[in-house]
Amino acid sequence: MKQFIDFIPLLLFFIVYKLDPRPMEVAGHHFEFGGIYSATAMLIISSLVVYGALFLRQRKLEKGQWLTLIACLVFGGLTLTFHSETFLKWKAPVVNWLFALGFAGSHFIGDRVLIKRIMGHALTLPDAIWTRLNLAWIAFFLFCGAANLFVAFTFQDFWVDFKVFGSLGMTVIFLVAQGVYLSRHLHDDPSTSKPKD
């Protein structure tokens, strides 16, 4: 459910982006609805609405949601201010690499890697498995960031489709692979430090 809520602004961005640009007037202001810039405005507005509603309901946002919202406001705002989609193309790579940095930093800060802090309440695994899983997430975020950057600046007509559905597809595949891997270790003795091959 949480993943679906996080996906709403991106889906609205995609829908508006795919519309043929058409002139509109609201309260005496003329603008073009459809295309990259109105889609960016929709992304900003819908992100504020979605995360604002979550904050009012839960009295908090997760760190990843704060990062996503701030990146949306910064890169989306720069895109609209300078009328250049280049800024928006950097959003997904930067967010993914910041996530990778956060997961990597947890190996040196605190007594548990980040993935264990996130999932440790639901799963009991040896520390070696948590470490390996955390490294997998670091690699995943680095790859997603690089893939988004490559597609955004190489395939101009395809990058929005990839941003929405390519990233989602990679995430689903990774989560399935993680589930298969974890299923092999769910009954491991947590005191054991050596993972299965």
From Swiss-Prot:
Keyword Membrane among record annotations: yes
Cellular location(s): Cell inner membrane
Membrane-protein topology: Multi-pass membrane protein
Pfam assignment, any one: IspA
Entries under InterPro entries matching the protein: YciB (IPR006008)
One GO cellular component term noted in the UniProt record for this chain: plasma membrane
Transmembrane segments: 36-56, 64-84, 90-110, 135-155, 162-182
Keyword Cell inner membrane among UniProt keywords: yes
Record key words, sorted: Cell inner membrane, Cell membrane, Membrane, Transmembrane, Transmembrane helix
Function: Plays a role in cell envelope biogenesis, maintenance of cell envelope integrity and membrane homeostasis.
HAMAP family tied to this protein: YciB
Similarity-based family: Belongs to the YciB family.
NCBIfam families reported for this sequence: ispZ, PRK00259.1-3, PRK00259.1-5
Protein name: Inner membrane-spanning protein YciB
Protein species of origin: Pseudomonas putida (strain ATCC 47054 / DSM 6125 / CFBP 8728 / NCIMB 11950 / KT2440)
